[in-house]
A protein has these predicted regions:
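Structural recognition of the beta-strand scaffold that forms the well-ordered cores
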Residues: 2-4, 28-31, 83, 95-99, ...
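Second-shell loop/turn segments in exported
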Residues: 3-11, 15, 70-72, 110-120, ...
Length: 215
């Protein structure tokens, strides 16, 4: 089955692609697109190949192609979240979490490599630097938990596991700062639920405008 997504809206592309993924269990799929190609890992393997082609690389003339795909699916792959805790100077249950995922894409095929410097050695480097500073000077009223999450690239598995199996009551978590792709933050930080927590959002904006540099 050959499907062109050229000219489709973003919402349409998501719906069509979701349907094509389901169809890939019963037949081979070729998707024609002009979107930027990306690489990711999956929690399952398709029964048939799902191939994405650039419009310029596709010929509408009749013909056949032959491909040889080598893949290996690990049904039981173990990965672990890594935790560190710096207690507040005063006894408290209030906690701030600083997190970063430590897995990365690795490589695509035999020739394309993703060393992972930006995604996400940069986040882990920042996490360790913050831990080093806070270890010497802990916060007065907040515990700080540092979490290096596993299996983010496969669908946020490590962070989801932590939420479903928390090491502390989630009501005690006052704030979470996730460090990811720190080398290319030209557009700033992504703030989730900023409209629900306007006070905290405005505080972040105030701190950002001060342009405090780590020393």
């Amino acid at each position: 089955l050959i499907v062109s997504l050229i000219g489709c809206k973003d919402t349409e592309i998501k719906e069509i692609r979701a349907a094509l993924i389901q169809l890939a269990n019963s037949r081979p799929i070729v998707e024609i697109t002009n979107e930027k190609f990306t690489w990711s890992v999956s929690q399952r393997a398709f029964v048939y190949p799902y191939i994405q082609l650039k419009e310029a690389a596709f010929s509408s003339s009749k013909g056949a192609i032959f491909i040889n795909i080598e893949n290996k699916f690990f049904k039981k792959f173990q990965a672990r979240n890594v935790f560190g805790v710096i207690k507040a100077k005063k006894e408290t249950d209030k906690t701030i979490i600083i997190s970063a995922h430590y897995d990365h894409l690795g490589r695509m095929g035999r020739n394309t490599y993703f060393p992972g410097a930006n995604d996400n050695a940069s986040g882990n480097g920042m996490l360790l630097s913050l831990a080093e500073k806070l270890l010497l000077n802990p916060l007065k009223k907040y515990n700080v938990i540092f979490i290096a999450f596993a299996a983010e690239e496969a669908g946020l598995i490590g962070s989801e596991f932590m939420v479903e199996n928390p090491i502390l009551p989630l009501k005690d978590v006052r704030f979470l700062l996730n460090l990811d792709i720190m080398g290319s933050g030209e557009e700033g930080i992504t703030v989730v639920n900023s409209t629900l927590f306007d006070k905290e959002y405005q505080l972040l904006c105030k701190l950002n405008n001060r342009k405090i540099a780590l020393k």
